Amino acid sequence: MASTQAMGMTEQQKKSVDEMVEKATNMGVNVQAQNSAVVSMINQTNVSMTFNENHNWSGSVVGTGYPKSIPTKQSRQFIHQGDAKDGSQGAVVYYGSNANGEPCGWLLAWCAPTNVTPTKPNRVYVDCGAQSKFDTISWDTIKAKLDVGPATTNFTDVDTETTIAAGVTSTGSFASVGAAFGLST
């Protein structure tokens, strides 16, 4: 199975991620989020995506929980409240399908430490591809990749022609995470 970690985001991916980070920032300010990651995701595929699973290394979702679905061409948000020691560290997986109707999955993981430092920065990790790839997830492997991840990244699975891009930034007392789930065609 071929896949590629892209060298850089396309202009469209960067624009989408920036818009989602801004949406997360506005939501965080409005609800006065503290020690949290405010996550905003947009579905740029041609079908609705459904929530499959989540994993929490530190913290938990608050409020209405994870969005059960993300309709096509729309965005959804949630707040992941961090704990005082390690901040907000979690992941979500959404299922949908690619342009050929094949079942696919998109994974977004984030790390928003309580006290961001040069040695403990905000990080994101993303993955996508055939749905079967996400049937059994090694969360230890995802965490190891997240622990060395950058603040912005993107990934394309060439077999399924799916793509995902994400970014995280500190916004005072919380982190804003933006992600775009899409197709590479």
From Swiss-Prot:
Pfam families: Nakanori (PF21230). InterPro entries: Jasmonate-induced_protein (IPR053085), Nakanori (IPR049065). Belongs to the jasmonate-induced protein family. This is Jasmonate-induced protein homolog. It comes from Atriplex canescens.
